[in-house]
Curated annotation (Swiss-Prot):
Active site: E317
Enzyme Commission number: 3.4.24.39
Phylogenetic classification of the source organism: Eukaryota, Fungi, Dikarya, Ascomycota, Pezizomycotina
PANTHER family membership: NEUTRAL PROTEASE 2-RELATED (PTHR37016:SF3), PTHR37016
Signal peptide segment: 1-19
Name this polypeptide is given: Probable neutral protease 2 homolog TRV_02539
Pfam families: Peptidase_M35
Disulfide bond positions: C196-C267, C274-C292
Keywords: Cleavage on pair of basic residues, Disulfide bond, Hydrolase, Metal-binding, Metalloprotease, Protease, Secreted, Signal, Virulence, Zinc, Zymogen
Amino acid sequence: MQLVAALAALGALVAPAVAYPHAPMNETLVDVQLTAVGNTMVKATITNKGDSVLNMLKFNTIMDENPTRKVMVFQDGAEVPFTGMMPRYLMSDLTEEFFTTLAPQASVEHSFDIATTHDLSAGGKYVISASGAIPTAEEYSTTITSTALYESNELHMEIDGTQAAAVEQAMKFTPEMQSIHSRALQKRTKIVGGSCNQNTLRATQNALGNSARLAQAASRAASQNAAKFQEYFRTNDANAKQRVIARLNSVARESSSANGGSTTYYCSDTVGGCKPRVLAYTLPSRNLVVNCPIYYNLPPLTKQCHAQDQATTTLHEFTHNPAVASPHCQDYAYGYQQCISLPAAKAVQNADNYALFANGMFYSLFTIIF
């Protein structure tokens, strides 16, 4: 009851206009160059252009080892749909294995096959580019202190469609999985019961309910609290505000029922995306969300400001689904300091900004009331 009362009052919270500290966002610290090294193989060369050592977190960047969205692929001016995974990573207690260290002016190379995360069977001419933000720590540290934005060159490739079609998709469905997913879509079932046990089903249903209430309350706060909206989304532009409100309302609707909707939700891994530190992931090409084992180690709803929990992880993942809101959100940055340092155009399209905004609004009221 206290939770419901707190969430219901969120929209009425009014904060004074204040300035908020930013984590340093450096737009010239890292250079990324793309080159073709095969029919669909791309090599990214990442160079530290600064004068100090960088410890770079690989999650959701051009260096991520998982089949995440590393590049944008266009043909005839239209973006080729991404078929890989969009994960939310556990960001607490980071260890060195998830970082790449670069000395000043040094470079590291990372190669990947774009045919594993895009259908390129049509063949022909394609344009590939990359943009994003790399969280960075100081040498010998895993504490994120800054973020380096990057924009790559445009890479033009002539791709053989037959060869591309022979490349196995990273998130490949088995015939059994395809059958389960098809039946779920026909029944418009949100949670696939066969993927859950009693405990994970209860936790997922609870997270959906909390996600709905958080999104509804955050939508009200976005329309009534200009200072907080500016803090999290770096703008008070009316059009941007309407996009954020509409997306939060869509997330609230999608979270409101476990028996219908536009997405399919799995309590356990189905396609092999639960890699180390992955809490949950989305396949935007299928409007499918999967909880990973460590998701259930999170609290249902945290009382810590900007901490991760089950409710905001579910909210985060729903923003990645095109059926919930189009265009769906990307993963440009993680964590409060990094997210509020994004330019407005990226902040309103970044999944974690929505999760953090919903959490921050709830936490602000929680500390006042309780």
